[in-house]
Amino acid sequence: MAKGLLMTYVLWALGGPVGLHHLYLGRDSHALLWMLTLGGGGLGWLWEFWKLPSFVAQANRVQSWKQRPEEERPPLSLLRFASQIVVGVYFGLVALVSLSSMDNFYIVGLPLAVGLGVLLVAAVGNQTSDFKNTLGAAFLTSPVFYGRPIAILPISLAASITAQKHRRYKASAGSETLSVRLYRVGLAYLAFTGPLAYSTMYNTAATINYVAETLGSFLSWFSFFPLLGRLVESVLLLPCRIWWLLVGGPGFNSSRFQEWEKLYEFVDSFQDEKLQLAHQVLGVPEGATNEEIHRSYRDLVKVWHPDHNRHQTEEAQRHFLEIQAAYEVLSQPKKPRAS
C-alpha cells in the first residue's frame, strides 16, 4: 500500500519525537532510535521536516532494492557516521548508569551496549551493516581501556568505523504485520529502558547523589549571572512544583519519592547559598537595608574598578564581576520561601 505524504506530515507533527511517522513508513529502526532519544533531542525531529518527501518516496519504492547488486555499497555519509558515534556514546552512558554493578561490565556490558547503539543507527533507512564485525570491534577495543568510563568514546569510534566499512543495503524481506513489528520494537524499547528504570528506582540514593552533584556543578556556572541562574533553577524545579499542585502540597508518600524531595530542597537551597555569598562579597550583614547594600556596592565598585587598578587588572576585574553579581542578587525583591 502506497504511503501518503500528508499522512506522514500529520504523524510527524503529532508523534514525531517518538517515531510514529517512521512506523507508518516501515522504518522501524528509525522509529526505535527516535523513541530512545526523543527525536534526537528534538533537533533530528525538526530537521526531518524537509526530509519527509524523500522518506515517503523511499518507502514507496521498497521493491527496487531487490534490483541492487549485492556488491553495491551505499555512499559514505558523514552525518550517519557522526550519529553512530554519538548514539554509541549515549547507549554506553545509559549502560554505565544502569548496569555498571554487574560482573565484567567493562568487558561484556559496555561494548555490547555501545555496539548496539552504533548498529541501530547503521540500520536506519534502507541501509544496514555487519552485526558480527561491528560488535567484534567493540569487544576488541574494550579491554584496552578496561575499567575507565572514557572507554565509551574509543569503543564507539571503533564500532562506527567498522560499521561504515561494512555498510550495505538491506536485503528485501517479506512484509510483516503491524502487530509483529510493534512487538519487536516494544521488546527492544523495554530492553533499553528496563535496566535504567530499575537502577534509578532501586538505587535511589546513588542516583540522587549523582544527579545532585551534576546539578550543583551545572548551577555553579551561573554564579556570575544570577538572573539566568534563577531561570535555570525554576526550570529544574518545575516538575516538582507541578507534582505539588497535583497532589495538593509538597508531600511525597513513598520513601523513594522523599529522596527526590530532598533533591528539590538541594536545588532550592542554592538561592540561600547565593544570598549568603552575596552578603559576604558586599560586606553587609543579613537583613541589611537597600540603602546599606547600595552604599557598600558603590564603595566597593570605586575600590575595585579595573580603571582604578591598572597594576592588577585581572584581580580587579574578578572582584568587580563578583561585586556586580552580588549586588544583582541582593537588589532583587525578596520572595517568601515555600514551607
Swiss-Prot record:
Coiled-coil parts of chain: none
UniProt key word NADP: no
Database matches in SUPFAM superfamilies: Chaperone J-domain
Entry-linked PANTHER family: DNAJ HOMOLOG SUBFAMILY C MEMBER 22 (PTHR44733:SF1)
Residues in TM2 domain copies: 4-50
Organism: Mus musculus (Mouse)
Entry GO terms, CC: membrane
Membrane topology: Multi-pass membrane protein
Name this protein carries in UniProt: DnaJ homolog subfamily C member 22
Any single Pfam family the record assigns to this protein: TM2
Source species, domain of life: Eukaryota
InterPro entries: DnaJ_domain, J_dom_sf, TM2
